[in-house]
């Protein structure tokens, strides 16, 4: 439901995700060197490099090293991603939740079911009314599903913010500025994509409240009373799809917590430059199980959102291509760094990649 005065948000988000995904896909394709395939792969590897994969080799000249450093930022800037993600997600969550509470409650499941049965019994006019009511109910569910998906996103970015501060011990390594900007883009565009179908109407609602506040003044505005049961009950009445998505999300989150704890324990001294081969858990099967867990987490969000909004699908496609490319780069780095690195391990997905 697009409101007047708002741009077509969903097409813009789709375009942004496609623009971010296509270079990664192109770099992964076997494009001949003669037409720039090797150059494209090198550029994308440089832009996406961070940590252990970005540091110049000892053989590189000091001039080359300083030139590279101009286009990098400290890897500890990862925290900026999650600060931005928390801010963007919290603002959208509170705004859409408040809009849903004020305008789209209660859900009235039972009356909707009875009205549908009644419409079949009494004739076409009532049936038409039932269809309108059904569309209204469907719209309500769509907005409350968005609130549910944003709640999952909020949990994700808050956890990642905590882990960045208390679990990971970042080395003095750096990451490319393009990768840094991509991360900032991602943590703004991801919650926007989850909420894209509801943002225009929620914005229209708040825009309508501003003139009313200006005309009436605070003293003559009705008191705001929030009923906690009405605030939460619609979320509890959502369908099985949302709860299946939540279970997938929780499983992926628990697995990623375990993987991050293993990675964080590999460098006890924060200033240490030494890398070791991670073992145990799924590290024995794939090089980047924390990336695999990230895919599971966002697949859970996709399911919980209802999988009806195209930008969410493009978000997930970008995540698959981006994390797969990064995992292959990490896997290749491990092979070059450690002679005894297990070649039986996959990069990210067992038996696939």
UniProtKB/Swiss-Prot annotation:
UniProt topology in membrane: Multi-pass membrane protein
Pathway info: Protein modification; protein glycosylation
Pfam hit, one: Steroid_dh
Reactions this protein catalyses: a di-trans,poly-cis-dolichal + NADP(+) = a di-trans,poly-cis-polyprenal + NADPH + H(+)
Presence of the UniProt keyword Endoplasmic reticulum in the record: no
Family designation: Belongs to the steroid 5-alpha reductase family. Polyprenal reductase subfamily.
UniProt name for this protein: Polyprenal reductase 2
Species this protein is from: Oryza sativa subsp. indica (Rice)
């Amino acid at each position: 439901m697009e409101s007047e005065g708002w741009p077509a948000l969903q097409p813009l988000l789709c375009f942004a995700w496609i623009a971010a995904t296509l270079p990664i896909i192109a770099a992964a394709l076997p494009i001949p060197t003669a037409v720039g395939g090797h150059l494209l792969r090198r550029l994308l590897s440089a832009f996406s490099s961070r940590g252990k994969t970005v540091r110049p080799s000892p053989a590189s000249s000091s001039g080359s090293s300083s030139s590279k450093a101009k286009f990098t930022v400290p890897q500890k800037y990862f925290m900026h991603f999650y600060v931005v993600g928390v801010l963007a997600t919290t603002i959208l969550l509170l705004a859409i939740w408040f809009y849903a509470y004020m305008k789209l409650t209660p859900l009235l499941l039972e009356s909707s079911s009875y009205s549908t049965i009644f419409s079949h019994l009494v004739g076409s006019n009532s049936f038409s009314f039932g269809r309108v009511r059904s569309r209204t109910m469907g719209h309500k569910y769509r907005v409350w599903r968005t609130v549910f998906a944003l709640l999952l996103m909020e949990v994700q970015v808050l956890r990642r913010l905590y882990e960045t501060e208390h679990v990971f011990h970042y080395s003095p390594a750096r990451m490319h500025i393009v990768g840094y900007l991509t991360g900032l883009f991602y943590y703004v565009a991801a919650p926007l994509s989850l909420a894209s179908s509801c943002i225009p109407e929620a914005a229209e609602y708040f825009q309508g409240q501003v003139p009313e506040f200006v005309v009436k003044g605070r003293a003559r505005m009705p008191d705001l009373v929030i009923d906690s049961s009405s605030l939460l009950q619609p979320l509890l009445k959502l369908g099985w799809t949302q709860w299946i998505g939540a279970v997938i999300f929780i499983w992926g989150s628990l697995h990623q917590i375990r993987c991050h704890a293993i990675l964080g324990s590999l460098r006890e001294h924060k200033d240490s430059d030494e890398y070791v081969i991670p073992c145990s858990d799924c590290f024995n099967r794939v090089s980047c199980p924390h990336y695999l867990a990230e895919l599971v987490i966002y697949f859970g969000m996709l399911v919980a959102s209802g999988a009806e909004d195209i930008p969410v699908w493009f978000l997930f496609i970008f995540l698959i291509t981006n994390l797969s490319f990064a995992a292959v780069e990490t896997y290749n780095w491990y092979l070059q760094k450690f002679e005894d690195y297990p070649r039986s391990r996959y990069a990210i997905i067992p038996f696939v990649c």
